[in-house]
Amino acid sequence: MAEEHRCETPEGHRLCVNNCGFFGSSATMNLCSNCYGDLCLKQQQQASMKSTVESSLSPVIAPVLENYAAELEIPTTKKTEEKKPIQIPTEQPSPPQRPNRCTVCRKRVGLTGFMCRCGTTFCGSHRYPEVHGCTFDFKSAGREEIAKANPLVIAAKLQKI
């Protein structure tokens, strides 16, 4: 008699397969809404992981397969490559150091020295050409620069009619 009065669920309602205490439906594989949502989420994560693994492996595997196929297609005839000798970098000579003393007074100038157009280094008081007796011809150099900057233009003669 106790068996007759036992609490049974109606035929349309079934408990969740995961035994969580909620009712499941046949549309959700007899899972409740919470368990079905968790199942869908796990399936999506597995699918995304599978696609990322396949995409990361495909670039690595494809060239290996192509190289292997290329080796099989080509018979044993291979070109021998000439080996180029390895060049050892030699130390390049350092640029010539600027003289760090004035040519006239031998005073140490360092970075404040002035290079004259005659090619020597001078201190602040001997930097002018008149003071150190420069041999450079500034007038002819100026004339040459002006001639290069302003070439002579000669127009073609017009014929008289």
UniProtKB/Swiss-Prot annotation:
Domain of life assignment? Eukaryota
Output the Gene Ontology terms for molecular function.
DNA binding; zinc ion binding
Pfam families, A to Z: zf-A20, zf-AN1
Q: Where is this region: Disordered?
A: 76-99
ZnF regions (A20-type) run across: 10-44
Looking up InterPro entries in the UniProt record yields: AN1-like_Znf (IPR035896), AN1_A20_ZnFinger (IPR050652), Znf_A20 (IPR002653), Znf_AN1 (IPR000058)
Residues annotated as binding Zn(2+) 2: C102, C105, C123, H126
Q: Read off the PROSITE patterns from this record.
A: ZF_A20 (PS51036), ZF_AN1 (PS51039)
Chain residues that bind Zn(2+) 3: C116, C118, H132, C134
Cite the binding residues for Zn(2+) 1: C16, C20, C32, C35
The record's keywords, sorted A to Z, are: Metal-binding, Zinc, Zinc-finger
Span of zinc fingers (AN1-type): 96-142
User: What segments bear the compositional bias annotation Basic and acidic residues?
Assistant: 76-85
Q: Is Membrane one of the keywords?
A: no
In its keyword annotation, does this UniProt entry include S-adenosyl-L-methionine?
no
- Membrane spanning residue stretches: none
- Free-text function comment from the UniProt entry: May be involved in environmental stress response.
The protein's name: Zinc finger A20 and AN1 domain-containing stress-associated protein 4
The scientific name of the source species is: Arabidopsis thaliana
